[in-house]
Amino acid sequence: MTNIRKTHPLMKIVNNSFIDLPAPSNISSWWNFGSLLGMCLILQILTGLFLAMHYTSDTMTAFSSVTHICRDVNYGWLIRYMHANGASMFFICLFLHVGRGLYYGSYMFMETWNIGVLLLFAVMATAFMGYVLPWGQMSFWGATVITNLLSAIPYIGTDLVEWIWGGFSVDKATLTRFFAFHFILPFIVAALAGVHLLFLHETGSNNPSGLSSDSDKIPFHPYYTIKDILGALILILALSSLVLFSPDLLGDPDNYIPANPLNTPPHIKPEWYFLFAYAILRSIPNKLGGVLALVFSILVLMLMPLLHTSKQRSMMFRPISQCLFWLLVADLLTLTWIGGQPVEYPFVIIGQLASILYFTLILILMPIASLVENHLLKW
């Protein structure tokens, strides 16, 4: 008799994805982040569902309803802070997952990579709209500033912004629709993640060497299920520590002040995970130019397969490219720092230089370094 997991139509899908899946024997802990992201998404959907049971998307009561969740709902404070800090963990895993893809050349699986970039956009949109919901000062002004960027689009810009707002300013209509979108988008993300996995399983996983691993596969279970559980425990430990010891560490104190359209906060800034893109946006004096740079800073990831000039897939044996990769990481950390600073000297010029370096590294220096390494191979 054949095992039910190999014959049952539903169990067969699970079996081929998580149990009998042939996986390379040498993938490192950098390959843990896919499962961690899945875990983060499930956590966010569950905590979000329980928050939505108590939240009201009305400008008069939104702030009070969040306060009510934290004060009066059983373990409401825990659910709220797990959701808020869970988003931070989600983005940490996302950035590490993308970084892994860049380092080891995983972007050569083009369908998987491009759907991954779409996933990144979708998660960023979800996080932005979620940040608006508590209706604090930073929620309101963040929504105003970011949606206003669309007015830079020629001809239709102003109409588009007013259409998104549902009026002539960020108000009740905006909050209600943002809540609706914030609820539906995670399910779209989950569907996209399914397609992401579908395309990944067409080709099989990449591995640190960047070479074909067809001749040396091992079953996903038990080897990588155990390995993923270790990653999951570390993630849970980190999230629990953050939530229980310092839940407001990554938040903005201004968001504990109810939204007031008549009072602008001294420094409007998004959550930490958007600061690098915000710094790129601010470093260009022209509004439309800034918006284009902002979008292109993420969209440039889609060009990675076209910019790959090396004869080797992975950076494992390419020291010049490795140096440039870590320079890119340092540059992104610099941009993140600058995004949280006021618009004054010397931060403006540092931000502009870091933005130029970001695009120069990706579009010019890394492809040239790969060509140089190809040439060095001949010696």
From Swiss-Prot:
Keywords: Electron transport, Heme, Iron, Membrane, Metal-binding, Mitochondrion, Mitochondrion inner membrane, Respiratory chain, Transmembrane, Transmembrane helix, Transport, Ubiquinone. One of its GO terms (cellular component) is respiratory chain complex III. Heme b b566 binds at H97, H196. It is found in: Mitochondrion inner membrane. Heme b b562 binds at H83, H182. Its main location: mitochondrion. GO terms for biological process: mitochondrial electron transport, ubiquinol to cytochrome c. Gene3D superfamilies: Cytochrome Bc1 Complex, Chain C (1.20.810.10). Pfam families: Cytochrom_B_C, Cytochrome_B. Its cofactor is heme b. Binds 2 heme b groups non-covalently. It comes from the Eukaryota. It is a multi-pass membrane protein. A ubiquinone binds at H201. Component of the ubiquinol-cytochrome c reductase complex (complex III or cytochrome b-c1 complex) that is part of the mitochondrial respiratory chain. The b-c1 complex mediates electron transfer from ubiquinol to cytochrome c. Contributes to the generation of a proton gradient across the mitochondrial membrane that is then used for ATP synthesis. Heme 1 (or BL or b562) is low-potential and absorbs at about 562 nm, and heme 2 (or BH or b566) is high-potential and absorbs at about 566 nm. This is Cytochrome b. It comes from Scapanus orarius. The lineage of its organism: Eukaryota, Metazoa, Chordata, Craniata, Vertebrata.
